[in-house]
C-alpha cells in the first residue's frame, strides 16, 4: 500500500465527482419562499401579523388568529400547487 492509497482512504475515493456533491435543496421550500413574496400572500401575511400583534398586546382575550392563519396558508399553498410539480425531476 503506497502513500497515494493511504491518501485515498483518508480523504475518500479520490474521485472529484464525489467530493463535489451538491447539498440537496427541497424544492417545496424554494417554491414556498417564492410564493410568499407574491402580493396576495404578502397581504395575507400582513393581516396575520396584525392580528398576532393585536392578540399578543392583550392580557385576556378570546380572539385568536386562526382565520388569518388559514387565509395565509391557503393563499401560499394555492400558489405552490401550481408551481411545485414543474420543478420536480
UniProtKB/Swiss-Prot annotation:
Keyword Transport: yes
Cellular component annotations (GO), alphabetically ordered: mitochondrial inner membrane; mitochondrion; respiratory chain complex III
Keyword terms of this UniProt record: Acetylation, Disulfide bond, Electron transport, Membrane, Mitochondrion, Mitochondrion inner membrane, Respiratory chain, Transit peptide, Transport
Modified sites of kind N6-acetyllysine: 40, 83
Top-rank lineage group of the source organism: Eukaryota
Subcellular location: Mitochondrion inner membrane
Record region (Disordered): 1-27
Membrane topology (UniProt): Peripheral membrane protein
Transit peptide: 1-13
Keyword hit for Electron transport: yes
UniProt-listed Pfam families: UCR_hinge
GO annotation terms (biological process): mitochondrial electron transport, ubiquinol to cytochrome c
A GO MF label: protein-containing complex binding
Disulfide bonding pattern of the chain: 35-79, 51-65
Coiled-coil parts of chain: none
Described purpose of this protein according to its UniProt entry: Component of the ubiquinol-cytochrome c oxidoreductase, a multisubunit transmembrane complex that is part of the mitochondrial electron transport chain which drives oxidative phosphorylation.
Record family assignment: Belongs to the UQCRH/QCR6 family.
Assembly behavior: Component of the ubiquinol-cytochrome c oxidoreductase (cytochrome b-c1 complex, complex III, CIII), a multisubunit enzyme composed of 11 subunits. The complex is composed of 3 respiratory subunits cytochrome b, cytochrome c1 and Rieske protein UQCRFS1, 2 core protein subunits UQCRC1/QCR1 and UQCRC2/QCR2, and 6 low-molecular weight protein subunits UQCRH/QCR6, UQCRB/QCR7, UQCRQ/QCR8, UQCR10/QCR9, UQCR11/QCR10 and subunit 9, the cleavage product of Rieske protein UQCRFS1.
Protein name from the UniProt record: Cytochrome b-c1 complex subunit 6, mitochondrial
